[in-house]
Curated annotation (Swiss-Prot):
CDD domains: AKR_AKR1-5-like. Belongs to the aldo/keto reductase family. Catalyzes the NADPH-dependent reduction of a wide variety of carbonyl-containing compounds to their corresponding alcohols with a broad range of catalytic efficiencies. Its EC number is 1.1.1.21. It comes from the Eukaryota. PANTHER family: ALDO/KETO REDUCTASE. It comes from Dictyostelium discoideum (Social amoeba). Disulfide bonds: none annotated. It is an enzyme of class 1 (oxidoreductase). InterPro entries: AKR, Aldo/ket_reductase_CS, NADP_OxRdtase_dom, NADP_OxRdtase_dom_sf. Coiled coil: none annotated. This is Aldose reductase B. One of its GO terms (molecular function) is aldose reductase (NADPH) activity.
Amino acid sequence: MSQPQNTFKLNDDIHHIPMIGLGTYNGAKVGEVGDAVKVALKSGYRHIDGAAIYMNEKEIGHALKEVFAEGEIKREDIFYVSKLWNSCHHASLVRKHCEKTLEDLGLEYLDLYLIHWPIAFENADPSGTTTQPLRDSDGEPVLAAVSIRETWQEMEKLVEYGLVKSIGVSNFNVQNLVDLLTYAKIKPAINQVEVHPYLSQPNLKYFCDRYGIVLTAYSPLGQGKCDLLSNETLKSIADKHNKTVANVIFKWLNQRGIVTIPKSSNPARIIENFNIFDFQLSNEDMDKINSLNSNLRTCTPANFCKIPLFD
């Protein structure tokens, strides 16, 4: 991948991740995510964040094929991220599901592959061909006797095989990372977690900085479940810079050294969200935004299991 200006260097000192990308979680309509990817890439984005469990990587693959066929944007210009789902942690399944993702996308390699959550479920299919978990009589996923160490060792092999350039994790807390760093031959390049002004994650950020792990912020606007966009402090800062509140939040993240991956299917908003490289927030602006933290989570595992990972 060529190195665009607005990137963060990863801890291998070779690869760089663009500061802002397009999130692709939960496209409601067929074609919606593919159209969003095309708009984003043609508007300057070079970072697309996906996952097998989003069930739309074939659609993204078709969009990438169309864009590449036009000739102006090449595969090496794009930083594509995908994730290994919880029911695919067994050593025998990691490569299989990475290759399935590559097949769906029509790509030969991933720029970054993440363990989606620090929890393993048994696979519903004995041959492990699905992302669906085996469920108990209460409908809850059955936990698998698979350690993060076992899964991480297989992730490291994906780098050796040339299937992925970098590997990382998602939704890992400090304790998860401390354990991982004791045995990792390849350190995680990224930890992707929820970060926004109401959940600023200063302690996790400090730890990740200390060990060379870049944070990526998902749900930077709180998934629309809180009043970030109408917050008076954020609105006043946005007015001062003649920017949107979303622009201010994304800039606040980037100035903290955090990648952000806002999701939108609205073409105008996709373009507007990228408009963060022509202004700077002052120290006073940053302090005001930092003061909004209330440790409010909008994303928990409750939508797929009853395990309180963040308690």
